[in-house]
């Protein structure tokens, strides 16, 4: 079973744009869910929406959550507390840049990596430089 990814952002447009990029990567097809923005289209995050996104992917091969900003991380941590323990044990919150981490995670998941390796791939992008 493939590892799924949940994209947590304060902006639905930002998260949906990232999902579009990820779905366009060669060999993609990784299960993706978005938990972004407020219920009326405003900026924000919701622990309830994040928990729902995780549950929509199911336990499968595990789930990695990537968040755009610090308060998104706090919402994700709250969401984890709300999950059934049997699911929570298979869900991991990545300490990674939102875009670069998501790209690395999708590539690893598409290659068949397990949830620990997908998480490690995302977190390995923390020090990636864009310029020499």
Where are these regions (language model features)?
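N-terminal loops that bind phosphate or other acidic moieties
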Residues: 1-132
């Amino acid at each position: 079973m493939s590892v799924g990814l949940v994209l947590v952002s304060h902006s639905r447009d930002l998260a949906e744009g990232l999902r579009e990029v990820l779905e366009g990567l060669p060999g993609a097809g990784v299960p993706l869910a978005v938990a972004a923005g407020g219920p009326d289209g405003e900026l924000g995050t919701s622990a309830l929406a994040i928990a729902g996104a995780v549950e929509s992917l199911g336990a499968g091969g595990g789930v990695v959550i990537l968040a755009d900003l610090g308060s998104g991380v706090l919402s994700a941590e709250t969401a984890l507390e709300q999950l059934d323990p049997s699911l929570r044990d298979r869900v991991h919150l990545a300490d990674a840049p939102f875009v670069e981490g998501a790209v690395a995670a999708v590539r690893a998941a598409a290659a068949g990596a397990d949830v620990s390796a997908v998480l490690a791939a995302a977190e390995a992008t923390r020090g990636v430089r864009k310029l020499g």
